[in-house]
Amino acid sequence: MKTPISSILKSNGLGIFLYRSFITSTAVSYTYDRQDVRHSQSLSSLKNCNYNGYVAGFPNSIVSLTVCSGLRGMIQFENVSYGIEPVETLSGFIHVIYENTNQQAKIPDLGENQTYSWSDELDYQFRSNMKKSGFAVLRPRYIKTDIVVDKKLFDYMGSDTRVVLQKVIQIIGFINTMFSKLKLTVLINSVEIWSKENRIDFPEAPENLLVQFLHWKHKYRPQHISYLLAFVEHPASTGALYPGNLCKPIYGAAIALYPKGLSLESYSVIVLQLLSIGIGLTYDNADSCHCTGDVCLMTPKAIYSGGVKDFSTCSLDDFKYLSTQDLECLQDLPMERQKKKPSRPRRICGNGILEMNEQCDCGTLKNCTHKKCCDPMSCRLKSKAVCGSGECCGQDCKVKPVNVLCRKSKNECDFEEYCNGNDAYCVPDTFARNGQYCDSGQAFCYSGLCMTSNNQCMNLLGKYVRGASFACYEEFNSRNDRFGNCIRKFCSFENSLCGKLVCTWPFKRLLMKDNMSAAYGQIRDDLCISLYKGGRPLKTTLSTYSDMSERDETFVKDGTICGPDMFCLETQCKETRFLVDFQQCNTSRDCNDHGVCNNFNHCHCDKGYNPPYCESVKGQFGSIDDGHKYYIDEGKSAKQQNRGIHPKQQLQLILYITLPLIMIISAVFIKQSKLSRLCGRERSEGTSCITEDSVSNTKMTTNEGSTLH
């Protein structure tokens, strides 16, 4: 039973510093319907609403929140923890806070339990001789995981896939808050919910269940560490894994059992302890291990205790050593590469970039583009100048009119941009959204480029070189050497087109290219070539790069097609539905099938169709982002988005309004003329003439008179 300590929490009542997300850009969830049909959905919409941090004013606190649909998560202070959830019967940012407690859950004593003794233990003798080093030597690392939820846990958590998914995200989010001292982040690569039935046999013994799950993992999730979250009402242990071997592909799985009545916070601690043991940490020795708080994370007491928990000095030393062992699953963070701290922004007049406190920047004194308008020494506008630099600033020192081209299209995935009539600088670059077909349906647009292997080979080796056949790619990328690999290992069959770039070599001479070595292979009718760019391969990879984002031009680029509706991403072949978010922009629904979605998730319309919804309007085209003027139909009037109404449409509008008005006035004038002639004739005959106005006036007088009586 949740004990409310505060029934209402306003959104501005909690100050929180939020940090990075932990859902990968290609993360996906899998569920099963009543017919046992599997459905997949991208988690990209949840990527930027799951965060970790702390309560402002309470440095020794921890917060893990998801704000995707209301505020959900956990808040920890020194010795107490609270859960927070939205009140579904109330509207607005109103939430319930309750203290996290375990409802008489029977949790095995990890201090005495030998769950892991059936596996080979690591040799930890190095710790006694290891010199303690400063915490600053640790650098950010991440572990990618595939999470699986069994049928019983799905039912225990409410039998609602949306709610269960949110709870899984909460668990991983809370784990990341505890791992923050180790600078370690657990990333969610996928979440599979066995909502219909379990996909494997469930033996009673956890170690036997682990063997069953490993077979499933090797078949369906071979790339990353896999975790099975399973419900057992009264388990004999907390789970199963191979201690210290989790980073080895053959042993890369773990089972975490969820007892009845356990809080989500306590279960998160169980999952964290299992993961820590899996990478090589051990339980703490109470006599020699110490932590900043009352409870250390790698102790049995941590599962029962509320409040902030921390890794001990023993765990820190162990992890420092493990981080030097080039464990395959401990990778450098791809989204937060170690960069130099950005220097304080300062103005540099003459660099051609408009910066703070500058009115203009036309370049150096010698190369100033607008000498009549801008002083290149002070970056100030000259007298009477409206602008002094920029693509849309004319030599007359005035902003160019709307519809003037300011940036040409580079390729079929890139769009033209126009001056909007208001700004001296061209609008931001617009291009087709990632995943849009190009090259007659043979490739995909990615980051504004049409990603074809032909173009990549031509850019690397010259205009006569083309991309190789699948047979060449398969031959080279299965070699598992520096000329054929997927960075850290050989490419599996399905990823063959996403590793090293393989091209056809049409020449009879050998390649002579600085800092490049080449391997050749005659495969069927083609002479194929693969390149290696200088340097000695790292210990943990088959290249000179440890991070996917740093790989050189001898690797296939992200976005390259690798099958029907498939694209390469970080040397893996993925389905395009994980790349494209159709909820934000859909060409059929939003663009009327007469345009494509751009990088702002707005429609870029074909010629003859008007943005934003690509409705048929003669002469219109483009998007609301490219700077050109377009029209929005409001009722019966057309209103221009940027600057006034087009002269041609102004004339049409004038005619539409004035012609009916002239006709009405003419009709009234003709009617009055006829009445005047009729009255003139009747007066000459001595009869009275009563017009509509006179009748109306007579009635009004009579009514007023009767009112006075």
Curated annotation (Swiss-Prot):
Keyword terms of this UniProt record: Disulfide bond, EGF-like domain, Membrane, Transmembrane, Transmembrane helix
Residue spans, topological domain Cytoplasmic: 671-709
Transmembrane segments: 650-670
Membrane-protein topology: Single-pass membrane protein
GO molecular function annotation: metalloendopeptidase activity
Domain of life (superkingdom): Eukaryota
Principal location: membrane
Peptidase M12B domain residues: 141-334
SMART domains noted in UniProt: ACR (SM00608), DISIN (SM00050)
Residue pairs linked by disulfide bridges in the UniProt entry: 247-329, 289-314, 291-296, 406-426, 585-597, 591-603, 605-614
Free-text tissue specificity from the UniProt record: Detected in testis.
Compartments, as annotated in UniProt: Membrane
GO terms for biological process, alphabetical: binding of sperm to zona pellucida; cell adhesion; male gonad development; proteolysis
A single cellular component GO annotation: cell surface
Subunit structure: Interacts with TEX101.
Protein's UniProt name: Disintegrin and metalloproteinase domain-containing protein 5
Biological source species: Rattus norvegicus
